[in-house]
Each structure stands twice: as C-alpha cells, then as structure tokens.
Curated annotation (Swiss-Prot):
The modification Phosphoserine is found at residues 107-108, 229, 244, 253, 255, 259, 362, 371, 374, 377, 560, 593, 666, 672, 697, 717, 734, 793. The modification Phosphotyrosine is found at residues 74, 564. This is Epidermal growth factor receptor substrate 15-like 1. The lineage of its organism: Eukaryota, Metazoa, Chordata, Craniata, Vertebrata. Keywords: Acetylation, Calcium, Cell membrane, Coated pit, Coiled coil, Endocytosis, Membrane, Metal-binding, Nucleus, Phosphoprotein, Repeat. The gene is EPS15L1. One of its GO terms (cellular component) is cytoplasm. CDD domains: EH, SPEC. Sequence repeats lie at residues 618-620, 640-642, 645-647, 650-652, 656-658, 661-663, 667-669, 685-687, 690-692, 709-711, 728-730, 754-756, 806-808, 812-814, 833-835. Residues 15-104, 127-215, 275-365 form the EH domain. Residues 618-835 are annotated as: 15 X 3 AA repeats of D-P-F. Residues 221-261, 349-381, 614-864 are annotated as: Disordered.
Amino acid sequence: MAAPLIPLSQQIPTGNSLYESYYKQVDPAYTGRVGASEAALFLKKSGLSDIILGKIWDLADPEGKGFLDKQGFYVALRLVACAQSGHEVTLSNLNLSMPPPKFHDTSSPLMVTPPSAEAHWAVRVEEKAKFDGIFESLLPINGLLSGDKVKPVLMNSKLPLDVLGRVWDLSDIDKDGHLDRDEFAVAMHLVYRALEKEPVPSALPPSLIPPSKRKKTVFPGAVPVLPASPPPKDSLRSTPSHGSVSSLNSTGSLSPKHSLKQTQPTVNWVVPVADKMRFDEIFLKTDLDLDGYVSGQEVKEIFMHSGLTQNLLAHIWALADTRQTGKLSKDQFALAMYFIQQKVSKGIDPPQVLSPDMVPPSERGTPGPDSSGSLGSGEFTGVKELDDISQEIAQLQREKYSLEQDIREKEEAIRQKTSEVQELQNDLDRETSSLQELEAQKQDAQDRLDEMDQQKAKLRDMLSDVRQKCQDETQMISSLKTQIQSQESDLKSQEDDLNRAKSELNRLQQEETQLEQSIQAGRVQLETIIKSLKSTQDEINQARSKLSQLHESRQEAHRSLEQYDQVLDGAHGASLTDLANLSEGVSLAERGSFGAMDDPFKNKALLFSNNTQELHPDPFQTEDPFKSDPFKGADPFKGDPFQNDPFAEQQTTSTDPFGGDPFKESDPFRGSATDDFFKKQTKNDPFTSDPFTKNPSLPSKLDPFESSDPFSSSSVSSKGSDPFGTLDPFGSGSFNSAEGFADFSQMSKPPPSGPFTSSLGGAGFSDDPFKSKQDTPALPPKKPAPPRPKPPSGKSTPVSQLGSADFPEAPDPFQPLGADSGDPFQSKKGFGDPFSGKDPFVPSSAAKPSKASASGFADFTSVS
C-alpha cells in the first residue's frame, strides 16, 4: 500500500518558482489536470529510464486516475530529483535535501549552469558525493576496492555480464585490478547510464576520465604498468661495481658491448583493439566468479570448440600463461584467443617463444633475463692484474645478476603471498560484508515476516467474519428458498383454486346465460300465452254475450211457438186470421226484441240471392280477408315458437300453422273438472243436418215446427237431427269451465258434418278454414236455395186441410228481426269478434278454391 502523501510545504521546501515553471509548461491553461501523455513527454526529458519513470508515475498517481493534479505533478518532479541525485525512488525520500530536477530541454532553466572547476567531468558533484558514500560503505583498503567487493554492487544492477565487464575495464584506468574513489565513481556513472538504456562506450571518453588521472599520458593501446617494488637494501652493494664499471668505461678499457642493456621503447601489442574487446566479452562470460582470472576448466570448452589438437592448445596455453600460475588474466586470455584465431582462420602456427609485441602490456613491466649474458671477456690488455680484475668484475656481475634474479624471485613470491593474503583478506571482508548484508536482509525479512504475520492474522479475522457472514447469508438464502417454495406451493394451490373458481364461474355464467335465455323464452312464451289467454277470454266474453242474446231469442221463440201451438190447437178458438195476426205480432215482437242486432244471414232469400243491394252492408264485402293465405309462408306452430327470436322474420317454407299445439305440454285448463267443450263428442253432431234444407216428407201434423223446431224443448225428434237437442253449443257451462279451449291436436282430423251438409252438400263447414292449402278438398256443385213457404192468406182454412205449401212460414232463427238489427257476431264495445279479421263467408270469385287462397269455406255468395 502506498504511503500517504506528504504536504507540499514539506515536499518542496525550496524552488517553488522552478516547480511552478515546470507545471506551467505541461498545464498552460491551469486546468488542474495533467494528462498521462503530457506528463510522459515531459518526464522523459529527465533522462531517466522508463522503469524508473513508471515507478514515479505509480507513486505520483496512487489512485490510478490516469492523470496528475498539481500536487501529484510536484511529487513526480520531486521523485525525479531523487532519482537524479542517486536516492531511492520512494515517498519517504521526498523530505531529503536535494537539488531540483533537471530536464534536457532548452526551456529548462537548469540547462545553462555557471562554469566550475569540475564542469568538464561528466560525473556531477551530487553523483560523486553519492558514489563516495557507496565507496566508503564497501570498506576500501588503502583507498582501493578489489573486484570481489565491487562485484556485488555491480551485480545488483541486473545488467548483462558483458556490459559489467566492459564497465570494469573502462573504469579501471590504471589497470591495477582495483578501483580507487574516482574510478569507482566512473564505474557507477556508467552503470546508471546503462540502466537508462544508454550504450556503454567501447573506449572511455575524455569527459569521463577523472581529473586526477588526466596528468598521465595514456598511449593508445598501452596500459600503465604496476608500480615497481622498492629495491632491496643489499642492491646498494653493487654500486661500487657499477662505479668501477663506469670508471672502466670512462677509461675506455672495456668494450661498449659490456655496458648494461638500455630500456627498450614501448611497442604496440599484436592483438588488435577490436579483437581485444570481443575477447574481453568472452572472458567476462567465462569468468563466472569475477575474480579476473579463468582456469583451464573454465576455458577448456571454448578452446576445444576451435577444433585444434590438444598438444597445440597446450602449447598456446603455455605461451599465454607467462607467469605459469595456471590461470589466465584478461590480457593473457586475449593473447591465447588471438593465437587460436590465427591458427583457425589463417593457419598461422603460434610461435615457440613470445616476441616483444606479443607480450601482454600488463606483463611488460617485469624485465626478462639478459640474453646477452654477463659481460663478455674483454680484450686482454696484457696486464695480468687488469685481466684478473676484469674477470673478478665479470664474476661479481654474474653473481650480482644471479642475486638480483633471486631477489626478484623472492619479491615475486612475496608479492604473490601478499596478493594471496590480500585476496584472503578481501574474501574475509567480502564475506563479512555479505554476512552483514545477509543480516540486514534477514532483519528486513523478519520485519516483513512480522508484518505478514500481522496481515495474516487480520486476514484470518476478516476471513472468519466473511465465513460467518457467508453462513448467515446461506442460512438466510435457505430460509428464503423454503419460504419461496412454500409460497410457490401456496400460489400453485391458489392458482388451482382460482382456475377451479374460474371454471365454476364460467359454468355458472353459462348456466346463468342459459337460464336467462330460458327465462327470456319463458317470458316471451308467457306473454304469448297471456295474449292468447286474453284474446281467448275476450272471445269467451263475446260468445257469452251472444249466447245470452241467443237465449233470449230462444225464449221469445219458445213463447211464440207456444202461442202458435195454442192458436193451432184451437185453445182459444181463434181463427186463422188471429193466427196471422199473431204471427205478425210475433214478427213485430221479434223485430222489436232483435232490433239492435243485425243478422248477417237475414233470411234465406237474401242470404242465397245474388242481389247485393238488398243485403245489409257486409263489413267483409269491400275486402276479402281470405284473399291471401296468411299462413302460406310458414307454419307458426310447426315447431317451438320460442326457439328463436319470436319477432324474427318468418321462414318462407310452407308449413301447417296448426302443426304444433301451443298447449300440448302445459294446458292451463288441464286440471278443470268440466269437460272440454270442443272435445270430440260421442253423440251425434248437432250440425250434421242442414236446418235450411226442406224436409222431403212433412208430417201429417200441420205444425211445421212440430218436429223440426230447433229451439223446441219438447221436441220428440232425435238428438241427432236437433242441433240444440241435448247439447247447447253456446251454453254457459262450457264457457265457465277452465277447459273451454279447443283441442288443436285434433285439427288434422276431418270435422263432423255441419248443419249445412244436407242443403249445401256439406261444403259449407266440411273444410277447416285454417287447414293447409294442400288438404283443402274441392267444393261440391252449388244447389239452389230451398223455396220459402208462402205466407198465410187472409182466408180461413182449416188446419186439417192445410198442406205444406199453405202452412205459414216459420220464423227463421237466423233471420234479422228488424231493419236496424245487426250481426250478433259483429264486434261490440267490450267484446272481441273472433272472426273480425278472417271472414269465412267472404265471396269467392271461383267455384273451386284457388291455390292462392287458403280459405276452406264454401262461397255462399253464388248460391241462389
């Protein structure tokens, strides 16, 4: 976790104006936000590597917003200054005192710096101070650091080994295998530049050479030799000999050949610089322990890879190992690789002995034995003493040379031992420093471990809390699932109940609809029945009123008949004149009693005559109600009259209007005890004979009404001939009962013969006027009307002598009694005429009923 940001007053104690100028370059509009691209372009001018800049960005933008505000940009500038000053890039180093950051840009105010004494050295003062601190931490010995001590520091940079080897070669300016303070600063400077993706130069540029090293002349390709060891004290003993030699030389007694060999000038090395650099890279890769030497085991694979023989490789190894140490330094390894390259590429065999230009530069400081040997025997002067002295001098010189050789060998051994001791000391110091570093790392690891333990404990607590919460949530989820399941089951049951209720509701609604339809149909049927009942009641009332009138007429007729009987019987001794007067009186009485009624039949002469002017105005004369068949289209009683809309349009098919009985199922008068008036009678029909037919054989009795009086109560004629004998069709008893309605179920049967069958041949009432057109029979031929009897004359004639022709005409019960008499069947106020709309006696134009007429009645208008 990133440390909390430090206030700006502590982060930037000085140089606020400089930081403000930097911020103005990236945010000239002062929006308070610096984008990632603008900040990256500006920070790259610092010369730092992308890795360091990425770390700086992460620290400056800890929340990962993708941009920097003013405070974050100041933190980034401060971290850049830390990196340029050699400090670690962390937020904890923001409080350190350090120079402001520098950016390679013309607009940067730090590009132009005042000249100083050390301005020509590339290592800045602050870097030098930092490198000096690191140098002191490595515990240098006599101001020098060996390769073993510098190696861990260089390895921490994670640079490739060849780059680190090149850095070592460039920084070891005096080639002594150690780095002093300035050389270490150069090495660290090169390492930091390499970390910033800058290439390491092949040769050290003059700007990187420390000022302390520039006083020495460095020849190209030459390397300064190690400082020689101080001469031993006993070497001073050879001074007299030198002096004597000098004296001898000055006297010219010795040959110039016997003088000491002079120092030879420095020659170039046979190994080219480019090959040397390439061989050095191979050496750094081979020198895994970085001790500056490679053993035979380390280079064996490289040498064997060349394909040369082992003897030749052993000879090359012996030539390169000039000091016979069993190891090769960097220059010796380069020389050996040069010999192998010459043999492989050019076929040049290595020499047997090294020439002066083949000796590595680091090995040229040690003089080899004088190949000329000691001083040669001088020319003999002929003086024995001088010759002895010369020989003694030569012997002393040889001894001196051998002693010097021994001294050099001893000094070399001492140097080797000292070097070994130094190396052991270095190893000890290195191990000590490594131990200290390990201890520090151990302490850091322990601290981190403690911190991790604390975090682990916290995480365990958090984990336990989370687990507890998970358990609680799991229990809650399980309980919720249980509730959901129960609710789902309840919901399902409720849905089932709802579906059942809906189905029951639908069924009830359908049943309600059916009942409503049935009720509606029943209401329509009831209304129809009520209308029919009302119409029937009206007809009954009319029939009752007419019946009462007929009763009165009958009584009057009976009284008249009784008077006639009395007159005829001679009870009062009256004459025929009195009988005629009585007849006239009865006629007047009848006319007076029936004056308000209009008999539609009037008299037979008028009834059956063709003179329409003598007849009473017929209400059915202007329009024939039977001109068209009202039931031609459809039979209203064929089926259920309430099955469909009773007001719907009638069907066009021809059906029987009385095909179905509307009272078949429910007769409102079924429970009455009185017999049906229209029920089929077992007795003879009173209308089987025509009352208007003339009796062919009159009885001997002069009374024409003795046997054929239809209104006589004491008539002895048979019940079959008397239409009113036993059963009065207009009696009050039949209409008082509840079963006074006609039985329409028997309408299809042929009706009995009517009272007009004898006179009209049964055509008057033989057919049902409401019968279908197909069932209507043809009418019989018309017969002339019977002649009426002559009225009695004024002469008195005995009763015994009277014949049928002389018998006075009996009053016609259907004859109108007065001029103002009306039709008893005509509709009155308060009475309904059942035949008001359909007149069965309307005249017909044809003798036979036509197909267009549905009437089954005979046409009485043409009967004469």
